[in-house]
Amino acid sequence: MRQKRKGDLSPAQLMMLTIGDVIKQLIEAHEQGKDIDLNKVKTRTAAKYGLSAQPRLVDIIAAVPPQYRKVLVPKLKAKPIRTASGIAVVAVMCKPHRCPHISFTGNICVYCPGGPDSDFEYSTQSYTGYEPTSMRAIRARYDPYLQTRHRIEQLKQLGHSVDKVEFIVMGGTFMALPEEYRDYFIRNLHDALSGHTSNNIYEAVKYSERSLTKCIGITIETRPDYCMKRHLSDMLTYGCTRLEIGVQSVYEDVARDTNRGHTVKAVCESFHLAKDSGFKVVAHMMPDLPNVGLERDIEQFTEFFENPAFRPDGLKLYPTLVIRGTGLYELWKSGRYKSYSPSDLIELVARILALVPPWTRVYRVQRDIPMPLVSSGVEHGNLRELAFARMKDLGIQCRDVRTREVGIQEIHHKVRPYQVELVRRDYVANGGWETFLSYEDPDQDILIGLLRLRKCSEETFRFELVGGVSIVRELHVYGSVVPVSSRDPTKFQHQGFGMLLMEEAERIAREEHGSGKIAVISGVGTRNYYRKIGYRLQGPYMVKTLE
């Protein structure tokens, strides 16, 4: 039978030939020990077959022969940063609902773009509906089960390991929603991982513990006034381990003028209660708010990191954006508000990043709201990179957790640790004694793993933590995801660093804190890890009596 010439083939057949050719070149490069620029190979090969479009990465990954998957897929992985910290993050959104403080302040925050009453009517509070997470949620009609399944499949297709999943529950103040809806939402997140259909939250958590895809934590976005004792207890039941608290400003006048609906005192109280319950606390902060100015902005971040009443474990930096339909948009249009210039904003972010202590992680430095929706504010989509470049010019460094992580260092600078040692940093925060333990390569400033230990204050309200108890608020070994039961000698997870950090934490709790018991706020899927080293479940915590 006559073989078809290139001109006789359909575009789909030509695309199949292109994908096969790309994979052949990748295999040859691997066998010769050469590095290869995938984008150049895709462009060149597509042109060779007369195609204007390049093959999709998802299709290339799907077509890799089984015997080469182990070596080629990690090289093809799209956006390796997504799992460089050792965890696949799955962001989900709850249904649109009104902001809880409307009932007593009469309005939402002046800068807030979203919500059911906004110009973006099908969006959740503080989102426009055009962010990637929002669009995935809208496609799934805000169904938590579908959002989770779709995102996990998407990450798998892009070559990421999804053995460990951390959920981020976004979409406004989740804890202001009715209890029945909250239970339904969290139950479905756990069920989407375990495959079990649960009748209640306790059953969902029980099955999630034994799931092959481990839920190593849930992060919930909330406000300081929805972070009180009953809210914290509910979140512990869900398997939540980290809180993202909307602070925005440490100035009382700014909180009042922007219609936040809570005081700065409420921020300090929520941090104290949350840390005494074992939660990791991430703060959302907004530089460039009305009536602040550059000097006051720098002062507030100095205060935020140095004052023991604040000192968060993590930071999401969201420079103020002017978006159509907000109160701030009207102020901007009438000339009563003006955003910082691009150069001033880069300078400010650079100086803020230089203030961040080594125990704090900067998760984000800008919102992912599409630029066409922004009337004034951030003009660059790569603000972090521009701030780092400015820091280099100024001769200052960012030493936050994320910048020093081994996985991130490997991706950006191809640097691997050489001389690893235990580093200890002690500080006082929110009424308790904090110890930040880490394994680092001090010469190259690379962080391999960390542990946050707290001697709870006397104000702790959880009965499991009363009377001389120390709590491990976080244990995390960085580097690419390694399944919980396996070892990969080239990756840093499961090389024993976690065990060494736990042993040192137990020693400090026993000998220095004088504690008779140590507790761990553990993600639902990692409880069995602690059972193996002598811990048992008490309420939402894994606990161990210290001899």
UniProtKB/Swiss-Prot annotation:
Q: Where in the cell is it found?
A: Cytoplasm; Nucleus
Identify the stretch annotated as signal peptide in this record. none
Domain (N-acetyltransferase) ranges: 396-547
Write down the required cofactor(s).
[4Fe-4S] cluster
Record PTM N6-methyllysine, positions in chain: 229
Chief localization: cytoplasm
Q: How is the cofactor bound?
A: Binds 1 [4Fe-4S] cluster. The cluster is coordinated with 3 cysteines and an exchangeable S-adenosyl-L-methionine.
Q: Which residues form the Radical SAM core domain?
A: 82-372
EC main group: transferase
**Catalyzed reactions:** uridine(34) in tRNA + acetyl-CoA + S-adenosyl-L-methionine + H2O = 5-(carboxymethyl)uridine(34) in tRNA + 5'-deoxyadenosine + L-methionine + CoA + 2 H(+)
Q: Which GO terms describe its biological process?
A: central nervous system development; neuron migration; positive regulation of cell migration; regulation of transcription by RNA polymerase II; tRNA wobble base 5-methoxycarbonylmethyl-2-thiouridinylation; tRNA wobble uridine modification
GO CC, alphabetical: cytoplasm; elongator holoenzyme complex; nucleus
Coiled-coil blocks: none
Q: What are the alphabetically sorted keywords of the record?
A: 4Fe-4S, Acyltransferase, Cytoplasm, Iron, Iron-sulfur, Metal-binding, Methylation, Neurogenesis, Nucleus, Phosphoprotein, RNA-binding, S-adenosyl-L-methionine, Transferase, tRNA processing, tRNA-binding
Q: In this chain, where does the modification Phosphoserine occur?
A: 161
Q: Which residues bind [4Fe-4S] cluster?
A: 99, 109, 112
Location of Phosphotyrosine modifications: 202, 251
Instruction: Locate the residues binding acetyl-CoA.
Output: 164, 474-477, 497-499, 530
> SMART domains from the entry?
Elp3
EC no.? 2.3.1.311
Pathway(s) where this gene product acts: tRNA modification; 5-methoxycarbonylmethyl-2-thiouridine-tRNA biosynthesis
Q: PTM per UniProt?
A: Tyrosine-phosphorylated; phosphorylation on Tyr-202 does not affect elongator complex integrity or ELP3 protein stability. Also serine/threonine-phosphorylated.
Give the record's family classification: Belongs to the ELP3 family.
Its biological purpose is as follows: Catalytic tRNA acetyltransferase subunit of the elongator complex which is required for multiple tRNA modifications, including mcm5U (5-methoxycarbonylmethyl uridine), mcm5s2U (5-methoxycarbonylmethyl-2-thiouridine), and ncm5U (5-carbamoylmethyl uridine). In the elongator complex, acts as a tRNA uridine(34) acetyltransferase by mediating formation of carboxymethyluridine in the wobble base at position 34 in tRNAs.
How this chain assembles, per its entry, is: Component of the elongator complex which consists of ELP1, ELP2, ELP3, ELP4, ELP5 and ELP6. ELP1, ELP2 and ELP3 form the elongator core complex. Interacts with alpha-tubulin.
What is the protein named?
A: Elongator complex protein 3
